[in-house]
Amino acid sequence: MQENLIKVKDYIKNNWTRTIRKKDYKKDFTMPYDYISPCADGHLTELYYWDTYFTNKGVYIDNLENYALNNILDLQYALKKFGCVPNMCRKDGAEYSSQPPLLFLMVNDYYQKSKDVEFLKESYTLLEKEYNFWMTKRVSNNGLNHYCTNHD
């Protein structure tokens, strides 16, 4: 079992570079920073919201904090553009479902690693914007939050 875990970890570590997408990778929605997509090959080449939380956990383990920061800054860019962090970052991404709000955890994780107070201050307003989105656009009649599409 331990040997298999080591193989998986080595595979991931050796393939991070295959998942890096250049900021202009998708022509329909250009991200300001290079980012890590969930797949090296295949159709999942956009920046996906909650996948990025777990991706960032992995890049921290492998000491690639700069990619975690890029991912966060790209999600913050999408939040500014769409008013929410969409499921996937592409031109029509805000039409798709939102996902659980994990941006605050990503910001906290990065801050815990970097101790970058300016980053934290700059992120605060955007985190407040995401909070307000969830408290006004993603709250049910019973007061609980839920994720859905803008058409629900």
Task: Give names to the regions the model predicted.
Residues 1-152:
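Acidic, mature catalytic/reactive cores of soluble proteins
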